[in-house]
Design a protein with these regions (language model features):
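Gly/Ser-rich "nucleophile elbow"/oxyanion-hole loop immediately N-terminal to the catalytic nucleophile
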Residues: 128, 132, 190-231
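C-terminal catalytic histidine-bearing segment of alpha/beta-hydrolase fold enzymes
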Residues: 277-279, 283-297, 301-363
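Short, proline-enriched alpha-helix->beta-strand connector loops that line the catalytic pocket
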Residues: 172-174, 270-276
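Primarily recognizes the serine-hydrolase "nucleophile elbow" in alpha/beta-hydrolase
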Residues: 214-217, 222-270
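The conserved beta1-alpha1 loop
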Residues: 140-142, 255, 280-281
Length: 363
């Protein structure tokens, strides 16, 4: 198969400033090719399937496009891989039938309509049935993952890791609920960012969804309900704590966007008992941590909070050794993407690990 060549053709962003979109063609690097079964598993017998492994990087191979107009991620449409050297012309069906996502195998896609008419799509992971109570972990997505397709919410920021063995071991087998709002959590009702003391249009209905999910799954331990998320989802995490301070056993807001000036002293007193683990990077130019996380942490500690932790990173960089800049140094991500450290279980406060800490919390 030495004569193989793969050309990727997809719609993408042509101009980062204007947001202009168009078709982009790229030759992909082939790192392996072999005879396989229909799921891509290597076989040593005759088969009508061939698996081709392609190199990826933070800037190469994503099947998603971030639309500047809607501020939402979506599946690239079209997304085609032209394979030269073989008599095939595969086309990934963006509606779902033609793509395999093993990361989603453990997840169930569902939906919920609240009494106010707001409809949520959501992904859920359910632990094996037994006679034990299980914690519930709730993940709230960022700006780009709103919409009606929860697979985007699960895949765009590696949320599927919450169903994998390392995280589940720390949680002692947890339910995971990943709600997707139709727009953005910070929606003020007019499609604009909420920037004052008014509630998000999703505050009440999101809690309704969570509470209904807990009541429908009677083996969820109501003393171990954990909530967190990134950016817009970090904002909504804080919103949930401020409105329902005795419901959640712990929280893990990441690069959260809730401006501290809108949190009253009385509200600080109401949430100071909640175990909270904050995460952010100093190079975040999307959310100003000096207006959000940093002053809120100071006020919580001053009010006597005894279980507040913070992971602060100088920047967001690749720690796997797989991705490098042109100078050979580790690839530097947008400083807003501090959720990468959370997803990779790299958040610490001294010797204390965030995942292990979360699994130990309870009302």
């Amino acid at each position: 198969m030495n004569n193989l060549k793969v050309i990727e053709e997809k719609n993408g962003v042509l101009d980062e400033i204007t947001g202009e979109e168009g078709i982009i063609r790229t030759e992909r690097e082939i790192i392996n090719a072999y005879i396989s079964d229909e799921y891509g598993n290597k076989v040593n017998t005759a088969s009508c399937y061939v698996a081709i492994e392609l190199a990826i990087s933070p800037s190469v191979g994503s099947p998603f496009i971030f639309h500047a107009t809607t501020q939402l991620n979506n599946w690239c449409n079209p997304y085609r891989l032209y394979i030269c050297g073989m008599d095939v012309n595969p086309d990934i069906d963006v509606e779902g039938d033609g793509k395999l996502c093993p990361q989603l195998d453990k997840w169930i896609m569902n939906s919920y309509k609240a009494v106010d008419g707001i409809k949520y799509a959501y992904g859920e992971y359910r632990p094996s049935s037994d006679d034990k109570k299980h914690p519930l972990v709730i993940w709230l997505h960022g700006l780009g993952e709103g919409g009606t397709d929860p697979s985007i919410d699960l895949l765009a920021n590696k949320v599927t890791v919450l169903a994998d063995v390392p995280f589940q071991k720390c949680m002692n087998q947890a339910y995971v609920l990943v709600p997707q709002c139709p727009t953005m959590w910070m929606d003020d009702g007019k499609g604009e960012y909420k920037s004052d003391t008014k509630d998000s249009i999703y505050t009440k209905s999101l809690f309704e969804l969570i509470d209904c999910y807990v009541k429908e799954n009677r083996d969820i331990d109501t003393n171990r309900i954990y909530i967190g998320g990134c950016s817009n989802g970090g904002y909504m995490t804080m919103e949930m704590l401020l409105h329902y301070p005795h419901y959640f056993a712990a929280a893990f807001p990441i690069c959260e966007a809730y401006h501290d000036e809108y949190i009253t002293d009385d509200q600080i007193d109401m949430i100071k008992h909640i175990p909270i683990w904050f995460t952010y990077a100093k190079t975040d130019h999307v959310i100003d941590y000096t207006l959000c996380t940093e002053p809120t942490v100071k006020r919580l500690l001053a009010a006597g909070a005894s279980n507040v932790h913070v992971s602060v990173f100088d920047d967001v960089r690749d720690t796997t050794g797989l991705y490098k800049n042109e100078d050979g140094l580790p690839y530097i991500y947008n400083g807003h993407c501090s959720w990468i450290y959370w997803d990779n279980n790299e958040c610490y406060d001294g010797n204390l690990n965030a995942w292990e800490w979360l699994g130990q919390q309870g009302n």
